[in-house]
Design a protein with these regions (language model features):
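Functional-site microenvironments in short loops/helix caps that host divalent-cation chemistry
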Residues: 25-26, 32, 37-49, 87-235, ...
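Short, compositionally biased
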Residues: 2-87, 111-112, 138, 238, ...
Length: 256
C-alpha cells in the first residue's frame, strides 16, 4: 500500500489511519469549555457555596488525539504491574486483583501510577483537562452531560453506589466512549488552578505550570448529586492520592 493511502484528513491535519487498539479518535477543533448553564436550586441545595471554578466558559481549540474508549481495567493494570514490577493498588491482596473484577476499572491508583501505566501501555499519556472535556462533550455544546441536558439515570452511568465501581462499558457508550460520566474519577495531566480558566491559552491549554493538586474529571460510583457528574465539573486531588473512587483513561497524540 502506498504511504499516502495510509493517511486520512481530520479537520486540517493529516493523521495516520492506524487505529490504536481500544482507542477512539477525537477530532480536533474549537469548543466552548466550561459551564454554560445556570446553577439549579437542586445543585445549590447540595452545594451551597460552590467554587465555580468551571467558568468563564470560553472557546478553546485542541488538536486531534486518541482516547481510550474505556477506563483502564484491573486486567490491563495487572498486566502492567506484572510486567514492570510496579506497586499494585493497596486493596489487592498479596498484589493480586480480586477474582471476577478483571473488567472493573482499576482504582486506588495515584497520578504517578497513572502516568507510568499510560507510558507503558503503548507510549500513551494522560489527557489534558481540555482534551478530556472535548471528548466528553462530543457534539453536546454547552450541555450538562454527554447525552444532553436530560436528567441522569441509573441507565446512563454508574453513580450513587455503595459497593464500588462496576464493569466498564456496562452502561453503554456515547460517541464511542464508555463511563465518561461516573464509575471512577479520571486523572488528567494538568495541575489544578481554581481561577485558571480565565487566563488559559486559547489553543491546546495544558494547565498551570505548578500546583499542589492534579485535575480529576467525570465523577464516580460514589457520587450522589448530579453536580459532580456533569461535563464541566472539576475536581482535584494530591498526585499521591490513591482512592477507591479514582482511576484513569489514557490518551495519545494523533500522528501528523
Amino acid at each position: 500500500m502506498p504511504k499516502w493511502a495510509a493517511l486520512f484528513m481530520v479537520g486540517a491535519a493529516w493523521l495516520s489511519a492506524a487505529d490504536p487498539a481500544g482507542m477512539v479518535l477525537i477530532p480536533g477543533g474549537e469548543y466552548f469549555r466550561g459551564r454554560a448553564f445556570p446553577w439549579s436550586d437542586y445543585e445549590v441545595a447540595w452545594y451551597p457555596n460552590p467554587v465555580k471554578d468551571d467558568s468563564p466558559a470560553r472557546k478553546i481549540t485542541v488538536d486531534a488525539f486518541w482516547l481510550d474508549a474505556a477506563e483502564v481495567t484491573n486486567l490491563r493494570y495487572a498486566a502492567f504491574v506484572k510486567s514492570e514490577g510496579h506497586r499494585a493498588p493497596y486493596h489487592w491482596r498479596s498484589g493480586q486483583m480480586s477474582a471476577g473484577k478483571g473488567s472493573h476499572p482499576a482504582n486506588n491508583v495515584s497520578w504517578d501510577d497513572a502516568v507510568a501505566f499510560c507510558a507503558w501501555d503503548g507510549a500513551k499519556r494522560l489527557p489534558t483537562e481540555a482534551e478530556w472535556e472535548k471528548a466528553a462533550r462530543g457534539d453536546q455544546e454547552g450541555k450538562m452531560y454527554p447525552w444532553g441536558d436530560r436528567d441522569i439515570t441509573a441507565k446512563d452511568a454508574v453513580f450513587n453506589q455503595i459497593d464500588g465501581p462496576q464493569a466498564v462499558c456496562s452502561k453503554g457508550k456515547v460517541g464511542g466512549l464508555c463511563d465518561v460520566t461516573g464509575n471512577v474519577w479520571e486523572w488528567c495531566s494538568d495541575w489544578y488552578g481554581q481561577k485558571y480558566y480565565a487566563s488559559a491559552a486559547p489553543v491546546n491549554p495544558s494547565g498551570p505550570e505548578t500546583g499542589q493538586y492534579r485535575v480529576l474529571r467525570g465523577g464516580s460510583w460514589f457520587d450522589v448529586p448530579p453536580l459532580f457528574l456533569t461535563i464541566p465539573y472539576r475536581s482535584w486531588a494530591r498526585p499521591g492520592e490513591r482512592s477507591p473512587t479514582i482511576g484513569l483513561r489514557c490518551a495519545k497524540s494523533a500522528a501528523r
